[in-house]
Amino acid sequence: MSGTPIENAIETLNAQIGQPSQPTDWFEITQERVNTFADATLDQQWIHVDPERAKEGPFGAPIAHGQLTLSIMSFLPGGAGVGLPSLDGMKLGINYGWNKVRFMNPVQVGAKIRTVGKLLSVEEKAGMLEVINEMTIEIEGVDKPACVAQSVLRIVF
């Protein structure tokens, strides 16, 4: 490759479109993390923060906030860049947003989750690259995923 860093990155990434990434490591959702998130967001609903009452609720246990699951998706090892290679000249990646977010299955406290990504598109925008990656949060031992969303990442060169 002999183009600019952005041109080289586009070529590299276009070769990976549609290919699933390796899953991240499993990450346990603890009651402490759920409580901390509840404190930060002021969402103190009992299905999240009251383990005794939550046992009697519709999920049989306390569950993580959907927004907590989505937030963690970006920061699991590899996060929003799951499957993206090292790109020459890349200075940083910026979380630009999310498309088509769906919370399909609640994550119970104590469950382990991981992310799998699949690169959907790469486009140059405003002197940066915009990368759209389909992200799936899987729950260990459960067939139905917790969340599927498209992360929109801007890469600065």
Name each model-derived stretch:
Residues 1-16, 103-157:
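HotDog/MaoC-like acyl-thioester-processing domains
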Residues 59-60, 88, 93-95, 127, ...:
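Short, intrinsically disordered/low-complexity patches at protein termini
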Residues 2-94:
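Hot-dog-fold acyl-thioester-processing enzymes
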